[in-house]
């Protein structure tokens, strides 16, 4: 009798555990069809001449994935280089309107998201390889869309190798567009640490202030693990991270990625596995490199777009880099209501700059110099 009762209790306990798990799995599968929605015309039919697809291309021996979206496949091609985490999923919340102007290629680079492979040799994930991949994908896009040149846009970590690709092969690009351009990232981290510590002290948040005081940022790489554990949490809490209105990596990034319908469930898992895989391998090189000494000139128009509230990548350091960078045409654009991602936070201003200045190779809307 006791054994039967114990058996029933065990089955009830298993049901209590399994049923919610199965319901959650079913819900995740339901919101993970993995197919981008088409652009629609006024009658609700697929828009003629538009493109909205998930595409895979073998680049330098590794199959790499990307989303390609545009209301007209005849528009100029814009190759977008993301930072540490592919951010196409954030377009669910933040409409950029970039696809109205360009055929946008949201490439998920080697080791990240759609291009994460667990068996990929770690030593192939380095900035030089990413520059080579960028140039190879550029040539593929030029051939596919029949365009002699395309536009190159990098954000945050993507600017680290993006500006190097633009310097190496200017003949392939109309212009280089930098959103939160990295310059001297180790100094940027010191400035961020100082700012966040002062903010928490001013606000009376002794717990977070103590965590930062116990994790100083010095002159050596790698940075302390204790600082890296608190960094993203603090930046989002203080409104100086991805966007000013994000206050939690978990709710605003992780949960948002789980709800993104363009990924399958497996691809959503790969998104975060890739972040763990690729983050530190690229991060330490970025920290130990002073780009202001590595790339001093570009032979194409250059546009720096930066949120004044950005402490993920320093606004004043980017501005100082811009002032010394040589280019035939250049413009620096301050986004006063933005942190790290102006095209999510101030999309109207971003589109105005792209149409009026970038597409025409001018800088009439740039900050006064």
Regions found by a protein language model. Name each.
Residues 98-117:
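Conserved alpha/beta-hydrolase
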Residues 206-293, 300:
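Alpha/beta-hydrolase
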Residues 168-219:
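A catalytic-pocket lid/entrance helix-loop region that shapes and gates access to the active site
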Residues 338-347, 351:
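Catalytic histidine-centered segment of alpha/beta-hydrolase-like enzymes
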């Amino acid at each position: 009798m006791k054994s039967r009762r114990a058996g029933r209790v065990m089955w009830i306990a298993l049901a209590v555990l399994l049923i919610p798990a199965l319901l959650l799995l079913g819900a995740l599968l339901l919101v993970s069809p993995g197919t981008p929605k088409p652009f629609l015309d006024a009658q609700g039919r697929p828009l003629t001449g538009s493109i909205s697809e998930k595409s895979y291309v073998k680049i330098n021996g590794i199959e790499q994935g990307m989303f390609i979206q545009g209301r007209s496949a005849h528009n100029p091609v814009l190759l977008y280089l993301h930072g540490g985490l592919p951010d196409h999923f954030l377009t669910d919340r933040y409409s950029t309107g970039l696809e109205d102007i360009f055929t946008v290629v949201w490439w998920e680079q080697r080791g990240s998201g759609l291009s994460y492979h667990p068996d990929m040799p770690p030593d192939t994930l380095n900035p030089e390889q990413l520059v080579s991949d960028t140039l190879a994908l550029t040539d593929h896009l030029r051939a596919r869309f029949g365009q002699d040149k395309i536009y190159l846009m990098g954000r945050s970590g993507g600017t680290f190798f993006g500006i190097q690709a633009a310097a190496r092969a200017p003949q392939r690009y109309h212009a280089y567009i930098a959103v939160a351009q990295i310059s001297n990232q180790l100094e940027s981290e010191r400035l961020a640490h100082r700012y966040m510590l002062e903010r928490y002290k001013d606000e009376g948040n002794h717990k977070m202030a103590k965590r930062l005081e116990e994790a100083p940022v010095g002159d050596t790489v790698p940075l302390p693990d204790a600082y890296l554990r608190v960094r993203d949490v603090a930046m989002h809490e203080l409104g100086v991270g991805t966007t000013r209105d994000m206050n939690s990596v978990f709710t605003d990034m992780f949960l948002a990625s789980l709800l993104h319908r363009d990924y399958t469930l497996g691809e959503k898992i790969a998104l975060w596995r890739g972040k763990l895989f690729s983050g530190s391998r690229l991060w330490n090189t970025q920290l130990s490199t002073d780009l202001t000494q590595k790339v001093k000139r570009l032979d194409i128009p250059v546009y720096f777009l930066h949120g004044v509230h950005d402490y993920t990548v320093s606004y004043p350091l980017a501005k100082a880099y811009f002032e010394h960078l040589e280019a035939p045409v250049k413009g620096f654009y301050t986004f006063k209501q933005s942190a790290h991602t102006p095209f999510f936070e101030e999309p109207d201003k971003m589109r105005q700059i792209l149409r009026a200045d970038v597409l025409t190779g001018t800088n009439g809307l740039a900050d006064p110099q």
